Regions:
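Carbohydrate-active catalytic/glycan-binding domains of CAZyme proteins
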Residues: 11-327
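Bacterial N-terminal signal peptides
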Residues: 1-8
Length: 327
C-alpha cells in the first residue's frame, strides 16, 4: 500500500484523508478509470499503481510498457516524461514524451487492449526536429464528443500548441496545422511565469477548460492556472477575457515561500464522485520530506457562479474530505 490516508470517521460524517495520497516521487501523473478501478502512471514510467477511491494506492508490480515497447521508447529518448492515457474506441492509448533535449524530443503513441496494459509501441506522433517547436512534450490527447475529432495539445518552453490527429489517434491528421494555444516562449519570458506546460482539458457546461502549469517545476514558482473556450479550436481566454496565447491565464493553485507544500502543478485528471463533488490530482513538493521529490496530491475542486474553477483558499491542503466511489 502506497498510502493509507483516511484519518477520521464519524457517524454519518464524511471521511477525511491526508495528502499526499501517493507518498513517493510521482510527478506529472495521469490517472484513468475502468470498471471501478483507478490506474496511474507518472514520469519515469516505472510501474502502474491502482486504487478503488483515488486515496488508497497499491503498486500493481506491472510495468506499463512491454519490454519491446520500452526498448523502442528508450531508442527515441533517454527520459520518459509526462504520460497521458486515454481510451479511443476499443483501445487504451498511452502517449509519452521521449526526451533528450528541448530540441530533440517528441511524443510517441502506445496502445493496449486492457487498461493495465502492457502498452505496445505504435510510433512517433510528432517531434521537435520535425516541427521546430522546442519542448515538444507533455501530451494531452482527447476526442471532442461533439465532432469526433481527436486532438493533441502539448508544449512548454516553445509555447503550447494543438494539432488534429487522425481518428485512430496514432498520427497527425493529413493537412493538419500546428496552432499556438497558450503561453509565451521562454526566450520572451525567461522567468517562466508565462511559459505554460502540462496541458489538461476538461469539458463542463458548454465550456472547454484548459489547465496549465507555469513557473519552474523545481521550486515554489510553479502554479496551476486555467482558461477556457467554447470550442477546442477556439481561442482560450482567462477570466478577464485575455488570450492565453498572449501569456494570460487565471491563477488556480499556488504556494507561498514558507509553505510546507510548494510548487503545485502538472495536474492530472478531474473525477466526479458519487456525491457530485469534483476532485483534481496534481503533483507538489513536500518540504517535510527533505527531498526534491514531487508527490501526488488530491483535492476538492469547486466552481463559482460564473463557471470558473477554484480551490479552497487557493492553496494545497494537508487534508480534505474523501471522495465516495463504488459503495
Amino acid at each position: 500500500m502506497i498510502a493509507a490516508a483516511l484519518v477520521a470517521w464519524g457517524c454519518g460524517a464524511q471521511e477525511r484523508f491526508v495528502n499526499p495520497v501517493i507518498d513517493r516521487d510521482w510527478p506529472d501523473p495521469t490517472v484513468w478509470e475502468a470498471d471501478g478501478t483507478f490506474y496511474t502512471v507518472a514520469t519515469g514510467m516505472r510501474t502502474i499503481l491502482t486504487s478503488p477511491d483515488l486515496v488508497h494506492w497499491t503498486d500493481s508490480g506491472k510495468a506499463p510498457l512491454s519490454e519491446d515497447a520500452r526498448a523502442k521508447a528508450r531508442a527515441a529518448g533517454r527520459n520518459f516524461w509526462a504520460p497521458d492515457v486515454v481510451r479511443l474506441g476499443d483501445r487504451w492509448m498511452l502517449y509519452l514524451t521521449c526526451y533528450n533535449s528541448d530540441r530533440d524530443c517528441g511524443i510517441f503513441a502506445f496502445s493496449a487492449d486492457k487498461p493495465d496494459g502492457p502498452f505496445e509501441f505504435i510510433g512517433k506522433i510528432t517531434h521537435s526536429t520535425d516541427t521546430g517547436i522546442k519542448d515538444t512534450i507533455d501530451p494531452e490527447v482527447l476526442q471532442d464528443p461533439a465532432t469526433g475529432q481527436v486532438w493533441l495539445f502539448f508544449g512548454s518552453v516553445g509555447s503550447q500548441h494543438r494539432v488534429k490527429l487522425d481518428p485512430t489517434g496514432t498520427a497527425v491528421a493529413e493537412g493538419a496545422v500546428y496552432e499556438h494555444t497558450a503561453g509565451l516562449k521562454i526566450d520572451d519570458n525567461p522567468s517562466r511565469t508565462q511559459v505554460y506546460e502540462g496541458a489538461y482539458l476538461y469539458r463542463r457546461d458548454g465550456w472547454w477548460y484548459l489547465f496549465v502549469s507555469g513557473g519552474n517545476y523545481g521550486d515554489g514558482s510553479y502554479k496551476i492556472r486555467v482558461g477556457r473556450s467554447r470550442t477546442l479550436e477556439g481561442d482560450f481566454t482567462d477570466r478577464e477575457g485575455r488570450l492565453m496565447k498572449d501569456g494570460y491565464a487565471t491563477l488556480l493553485l499556488s504556494s507561498d515561500p514558507e509553505d510546507t507544500f510548494y510548487g503545485p502543478g502538472h495536474n492530472g485528471e478531474i473525477f466526479t464522485d458519487l456525491r457530485g463533488q469534483d476532485y483534481m490530482l496534481f503533483h507538489c513538493h513536500n518540504r517535510a520530506s527533505g527531498t526534491r521529490s514531487r508527490f501526488t496530491f488530491l483535492q476538492r475542486l469547486f466552481w463559482d457562479a460564473e463557471g470558473w474553477p477554484y480551490f479552497e483558499g487557493g492553496k494545497v491542503l494537508a487534508e480534505d474530505l474523501a471522495p465516495l466511489f463504488g459503495r
